[in-house]
């Protein structure tokens, strides 16, 4: 009886150890654990680095959409990324009369797919260094590699670098970026 329990315990330990890499933890973002069982909106709301993004998503009326089943890839600008915009821009965009413009900007950060960084890097390589990324907002970003980092070039030539990649969500993936991507003027 004891041998049987020891054998079962050993088999369970080996099985768990073999499966451990499949359960790799998501990175921390903004000081908060990102849970792959939560939606993009739920996780972003927990990140202290994404309070401006969350406020913008609420002001644009995109909470329900980004809480939906997806899959979505969101290139999520940090508060510091929003702070790089000209003074007063964020405040102006958050006003109700600018909802359409804000929605356009935010949806230029969203792709209707679950695009992990290895897949993006492969598409960049397959396309000889630059891969067009069509967003739900109608923008076409250019994904490129800068060393081992993925960068995104917006329609105005602005460049955002992915600083934290592959943050899995229940409805897609977040890639944290350091610059707000803007649609063509």
Label the model's feature ranges:
Residues 16-24:
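Sec/Tat signal peptide C-region and signal peptidase I cleavage site
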